[in-house]
Amino acid sequence: MKKILSVIIAVLFIGIANGQTLLIYGGSNHDVYLGKLNASRYDSESIWNEYGRYGSKYNSNSIWNEYGQYGSKYSSYSPFNEYGSNPPVLVDSQGNFYGYFTANRYRPKRANFDLVNIICEYHEKIREDVGEWYDKIF
């Protein structure tokens, strides 16, 4: 089962990994920078760099901090709240909007692409070993 999941994930993300780097912004006015969604695990601003500010599960502005407002499944500002009303947005470096980063399937303009869907579905497992999941996905 793990092998099948790994292969499916790898195939789904090939296009995204090579595409435009997406930036995550949270907060009520979407003015709180939360890191880069699909950047290298060695990028200091990547959510996949577990030693960096945005990839650490201990940083208050990390989506991987289950006790923080951007990582808790109970916070309206978290992408992992299935009923969240203020989820983060995804934009590129020019500010083009790619959708809301949210597990809330009823949210209009929700980013509905594979990387976001996998992160929302497996966030609890991912936060336990961000590096391992990066290797599976990219």
Regions found by a protein language model. Name each.
Residues 4-15:
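Sec-dependent N-terminal signal peptides
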